[in-house]
Amino acid sequence: MTKKLDMTVLSTLPDTIATPAFDRSTLSAGILHIGVGNFHRAHQAVYLNRLFERGEGLDWAIVGAGLMPYDRAMRDRLHPQDWLTTVVELDPGGLSAQVCASMIDFVDVDPPALIDRLCQPDIRIVSLTITEGGYFVDPTTGGFDVSHPEILADLENPEKPSTVFGVLYAALARRRATQMAPFTVMSCDNLPENGLMARQAVVGYARAVSAKQADWIEENVAFPSGMVDCITPATGERERALIRETFDIEDAAPVVCEPFRQWVLEDNFPSGRPALEKVGVEFVSDVAPYELMKLRILNGGHAAIAYVGALRGHHFVHEAMTDPLIRAYLNKLESEEILPTVPEIPGVSFQTYLATVMDRFSNAAVGDTISRLCLDGSNRQPKFILPVILDRLDNSLNITGLALETALWCRYCLGSDEAGREILLEDENADSLKAWAKSAFSDSTATVWPELFGPLATNTVFLAEFEKAADKLQRLGVTDTLADYVSGP
């Protein structure tokens, strides 16, 4: 019989579900998390749950919070089940489930209530998952966008803010006025230098209100950066039904994720932190090398298989990974051209990390799609592939595979796969990309799009390699070009 999840049913759940191995009544709050989505509950909440199961860090339980309508919807779903979440790991060998109990409360979705809770001394860390767009970055300058309408509205009425950074400013100002130590602001969003992004937003907002307050925040508030990783697909009715049928539990807001998770944190917590190193979190002095490793090996790998996977007619990522040509192409490209550009990290084997990445890409249970990886190529290629090309050229190293990857992306932008089936190009620059692709595959001399490629647009070595790869694709087709690359020196 299916049971609705709450504290009263934990002892009656089947043995197939791991339940909390700690007395929840012994927990007290230490972290307030803004943006309680799927990723937070599959990642940070699970790490803390593991720590509590060791009987440690019991004063670091999570209080959920948010300011958006979807935060209110999440609160409404979690409240009747006592803030519990069923986390199902999509392992190729079979599903596994656990009830995560590290969240003990969720503040009313109301800015004054949130500010009040932030000003309680038990809150020593404020963590964030508010998405990349939530940091109000000016697309032109890269700085904090103080002219954004939502920010302007808060600045006109700073006593009643409605944005995350207006709320954080108000809470920090009140804590300072009452001589209470500030909390640490810990971004858990999946973007490079997330701590610097959080600092830029909080200080940028503060400086628009009070220079003295901004100076105090810069001097006294810590913003550690972190690298986070765990594939967490969206939860829909299919996932809720899967959990009902497999585990006999009714959860209004379950989470599904891959078994892999990683968290590397800059160890900068002046107000204290839980001992998460005991449950697998890596604390380091500098997160940047780990971010670069992930950016190039994992994100670069996604970019590498996306377009060739689409051109060879694959729908799912795991299907592409069973294609011997694509798997061999990815392994050669990563091993010979991408991995050597990542600076060494003591104690980390990049080949082992690559093997883990390829295993993750091969996980059929996750059901990741090629079309998702192909989205916004004009935004992703400059982040994940072009910097690697520049690094190799600066060191006079060959770029044969990377030029082929770029040519495969260009071929994808023509809008059809190798069998002639239509490809829907989902990119804000779709029209420009199509025009570029038609030009590159019709002219005797293939060219690149200057606005996108920057200095590579005039680099003769890159242009020659790109032209060679595009010409080969045009003459031989995708399959034979791949085979030629894989079997080559």
Task: Give short role names for the model-derived ranges.
Residues 2-489:
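Substrate/ligand-engaging "lid" and interaction regions
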